[in-house]
């Protein structure tokens, strides 16, 4: 990690102490073409990136950096602009049909989206935006053009990368197209700074896309510690009362008090591998049929990506495995209720094939629940193996079943790991992430100015 900018650690030359005396940006244009920060996470293309953008924008505004988020309008009823929070404006851009447009079809609408962004900017003086921060490769192409037109630096966050996803495909998943690989390579070359969630992601940018290490900054995403906590806000636990919080959450959600509850929360698609959890439960019940009467498996989320092609596929799998009686499918829920699902669970299960970070893993831990996850991407950073949860190498359902059996046989495992998880999550606040991001912005601005001066020699 030492070769990258990380958590205000060693700085690249662009962020030397002398240059840090310069001001941070006043106003940032954030781009999120394919998914709106106003959408409900857990379905369609809305997920951790939506939460990331909302939380980051609000915390940047709190340190006096205004944020305007440009996103594609998905209904005609949307107003041109919505104030998300003081200092945070969401601008809806018309580009293509409002509904029925798959993410794979969006590259054809990037010209229209860019035109809409330029129209919104046209009434402003030069320098209105100090910096462009794009999220995901589709936004990166718009950001590249906007930054050039506005004379501003470009900061880009990949969130996911085609080459990494293609190297870790789930069965039945669709490979990312070559056009995306080419596009990501161009964005990496054009960006003044690249933000990676973890040191591993930073290494992947360098290894797969020839990114300049001096331009890569590692900024761990955060968690809303006011929302995701072992006890709901306003309720103060006494010593050793975290179990009471779990019992109360189960009562609110209508879940049995003595059940083993392995929870899946997220978009239902092959990449997230909810089928691995179901297969693991089937293995567990084959070995320990007496557990059937005290296991409940909630699946909270909606179909997304290639999962949209077979929206009933997971329900049919549960029936084929003979576990439909213990699986409960629930639609995506808001953040407050999601926190309750985390509190109620014995363990959150994330068998993903690829995760740039795994935001829900930190959210669950902040709520006092351990995590059982695949040892991929950023999950080994989010989860402390053996302390705040368990990491599994590979996707063998039997390996996950063994860990679930440990939770079933050791009732103290959930509260013990859950307490450690809640403490671990405290180091992932969004305020810290926003402060570090602002530092990256300042470094990008100074680097851009030096580059412009050198060109004009």
UniProtKB/Swiss-Prot annotation:
GO terms for biological process: mycothiol biosynthetic process. It comes from the Bacteria. It holds the Pfam family Glyco_trans_4_4. The keyword Cell membrane does not apply. UDP-N-acetyl-alpha-D-glucosamine binds at residues 40-41, 48, 267, 272, 333, 355, 363. 1D-myo-inositol 3-phosphate binds at residues 34, 45-50, 103, 136, 160, 180. Keywords: Glycosyltransferase, Magnesium, Metal-binding, Transferase. Induction: Transiently induced by thiol-oxidant diamide, under control of SigR. Also induced when mycothiol is oxidized or conjugated. It catalyses: 1D-myo-inositol 3-phosphate + UDP-N-acetyl-alpha-D-glucosamine = 1D-myo-inositol 2-acetamido-2-deoxy-alpha-D-glucopyranoside 3-phosphate + UDP + H(+). Homodimer. Catalyzes the transfer of a N-acetyl-glucosamine moiety to 1D-myo-inositol 3-phosphate to produce 1D-myo-inositol 2-acetamido-2-deoxy-glucopyranoside 3-phosphate in the mycothiol biosynthesis pathway. Belongs to the glycosyltransferase group 1 family. MshA subfamily. This is D-inositol 3-phosphate glycosyltransferase. It comes from Streptomyces coelicolor (strain ATCC BAA-471 / A3(2) / M145). The gene is mshA.
């Amino acid at each position: 990690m030492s070769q990258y900018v990380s958590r205000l650690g060693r700085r690249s030359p662009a962020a030397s102490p002398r240059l840090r005396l310069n001001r941070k940006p006043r106003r940032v244009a954030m781009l999120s073409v394919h998914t709106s920060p106003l959408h409900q996470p857990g379905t369609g293309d809305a997920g951790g990136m939506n939460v990331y953008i909302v939380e980051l924008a609000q915390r940047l505004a709190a340190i006096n950096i205004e944020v305007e988020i440009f996103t594609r309008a998905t209904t005609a009823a949307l107003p041109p602009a919505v104030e998300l929070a003081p200092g945070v404006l969401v601008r809806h851009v018309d580009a293509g049909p409002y509904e029925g447009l798959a993410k794979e079809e969006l590259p054809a609408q990037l010209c229209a989206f860019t035109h809409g962004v330029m129209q919104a900017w046209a009434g402003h003086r030069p320098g209105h935006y100090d910096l462009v921060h794009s999220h995901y490769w589709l936004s990166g192409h718009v950001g590249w053009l906007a930054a050039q037109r506005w004379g501003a630096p470009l900061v880009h966050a990949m969130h996911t990368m085609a080459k990494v996803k293609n190297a870790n495909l789930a069965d039945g998943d669709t490979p990312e197209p070559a056009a995306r690989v080419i596009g990501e390579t161009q964005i990496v070359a054009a960006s003044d700074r690249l933000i990676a969630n973890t040191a591993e992601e930073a290494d992947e940018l360098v290894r797969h896309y020839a990114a300049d290490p001096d331009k890569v900054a590692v900024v761990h995403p955060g968690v809303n510690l006011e929302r995701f906590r072992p006890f709901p806000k306003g309720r103060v636990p006494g010593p050793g009362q975290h179990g009471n919080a779990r019992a109360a959450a189960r009562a609110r959600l209508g879940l049995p008090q003595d059940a083993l509850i392995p929870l899946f929360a997220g978009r239902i698609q092959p990449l997230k591998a909810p089928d691995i959890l179901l297969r693991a439960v089937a293995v567990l019940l084959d070995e320990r049929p007496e557990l059937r009467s005290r296991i409940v498996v909630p699946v909270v989320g909606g179909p997304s990506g290639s999962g949209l092609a077979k929206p009933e596929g997971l329900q049919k799998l549960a029936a084929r495995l003979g576990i439909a009686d213990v699986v409960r499918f629930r639609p995506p829920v808001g953040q407050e209720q999601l926190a309750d699902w985390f509190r109620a669970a014995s363990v959150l299960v994330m068998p993903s094939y690829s995760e740039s970070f795994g935001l829900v893993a930190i959210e669950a831990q902040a709520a006092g629940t351990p995590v059982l996850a695949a040892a991929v991407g950023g999950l080994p950073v989010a989860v402390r193996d053996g302390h705040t949860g368990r990491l599994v190498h590979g996707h063998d359902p039997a390996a996950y079943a063994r860990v679930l059996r440990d939770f079933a046989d050791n009732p103290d495992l959930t509260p013990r790991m859950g307490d450690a998880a809640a403490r671990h999550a405290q180091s992932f606040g969004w305020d810290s992430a926003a402060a570090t991001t602002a530092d990256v912005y300042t470094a990008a601005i100074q680097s851009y100015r030096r580059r412009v001066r050198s060109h004009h020699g």
